[in-house]
Structure formats: C-alpha cells, structure tokens
Amino acid sequence: MKWIGRIAGGLALLYVLLCAVLYAYQETLIFRPRQLAPDYAFERGEEFFVRAADGVRLNVVAFRKPEARGAILFLHGNRGSNRRSLYQTEGLSDADYDLYLFDYRGYGKSEGKIVSEDQLYADAQVMYDTLRRHFPEENIVVAGYSLGTGMASYLAAENRPRHCVLAAPYASITAMKNLWLWMVPDFILKYPLNTVDNVARATCPVTVLHGQGDDFIPFGMAEEIKAVAPDRVELIPLPGVGHRGAILDPAFVRTVLRVIK
C-alpha cells in the first residue's frame, strides 16, 4: 500500500505547487497591460498625468468642453490601454460632460506596477478626487468595463457619484477564480475585487449591462449584482452579445448619455 501513500504525497505536492504558482503569478494572469512609448501621441483628446500617493504618474486622456456640466470617468478592462479606450468610448466624447480615460499602473504611459488591491483602489480614488475638485459629485458618473467594474463599483461605494455604469461586471475575482480553480483556497488571491459587496455599500443608482452570450463572465454574475439592491440596480441584458461586445454595444453609450441628462 506504500504506492497509495506515494501517489497521495505526490498529489499533495502538486497542489501546493499549483497554489504557490498562482499566488506568485496572479498579476500576470489578471492584468494584461499594453504599454505605450513615452513619446506616443494619442490621436484624439488632451493628455495629462495625475500623481498617485507614492508619486507614480498615472496617464489620463481627457475630452474637455468649455461649458461641461460634469465628468464621466471610464475605467477599462484588463487588456490594452487608453489607446483602446479611445474607440470603446468614442460615442461619449461629444457629450456635454467631460470624458476622462484613466490608465492603471503599467498600462499605456502610466508608470509603476500593480502590487495590491488597496493600491488599485487608491489610484482610482486619486483620479476621482481630481474630478471632484472641478465638479460636484452629483455631476460625476463612474463607468467601468470588465476588470474596471471592480474599481468603478468601489468608487461608487466610497463616494457619492451621480451614477455608476458597469459593463460586463464580475461578482468578484474570487468568484471568477472559483469557476475554474475552485480547489484553490480564496486566501491565495491578493485581488478579490468584490463588486457585489461594493454595489451593496453604494448609495447611488447603478446600471449593469451584460451580454447574455458572455462565455467569460457569466450573465448570472450580473444577476447577483442586481439582487443585492434590486430597487437601486438596473440590469440591461444584451441578447446574443459576448464579453467584448458589451462595451461596444450601442446600449452602453445610450445608457451613459441617459444618466447624465
């Protein structure tokens, strides 16, 4: 029976190694930044930088209007950079609200490296505070897509924006991990990014858009978010739309334009 013990020991070792690898490389699995050269010139918009608490410079592309009534802050997904955000939000640049596209650390022309959930949230708050110096909160809309819905919902929970729009949101990164790696303990994750909890704590209206054909983040996660505050959360199903299609569907732009009226 010694062979049974050897097999069990080998499986246990493989399990420990799997957990160790996932812990060490989770940033690589979660974040897929596309960096841009320091001299890269965006084809549209006005570029500037904000400084994080530790002095790291974070890149912003803005579309400002002389008589803007408020501001829209867009937080993108786990891939790309502000360069991709330009076409994902193209229909919003002519609204009578300023539009701000924000790159996380290591994305686009932003400096630094993402190392913790608290850091992600704090950087997003720095950007929100920048807008709050120019506009009352009742005229600030936060919008997020995919990965960015975790930060957008956090800003909604910690502040009092006019509205929060979430395209293709996840219930949490922990829930996403459990879809495929349920055997790995939750404490391994440094980035739980609990959107459900954030939306439950928020006081502003929330609109969720989610493709019913999304085979990456299940539509059921949008229903979970709706369930935590059914009177305050609006869920807009997008029939036949997949994960990437949620941010490109005309319903996203229509929704944001509706909530700023």
Predicted regions and their residues:
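Catalytic histidine-centered segment of alpha/beta-hydrolase-like enzymes
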Residues: 241-251
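An N-terminal hydrophobic leader/cap segment in hydrolases
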Residues: 3, 7-51
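Alpha/beta-hydrolase fold nucleophile elbow
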Residues: 136-146
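Short alpha-helix in the alpha/beta-hydrolase fold that links the catalytic acid
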Residues: 88, 195, 204, 218-227
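Short beta-strand/loop motif that positions the catalytic acidic residue
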Residues: 202-203, 208-210, 214
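Active-site nucleophile loop of the alpha/beta-hydrolase fold
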Residues: 165-175, 195
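Acidic catalytic loop of the alpha/beta-hydrolase fold
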Residues: 213-217, 243-244
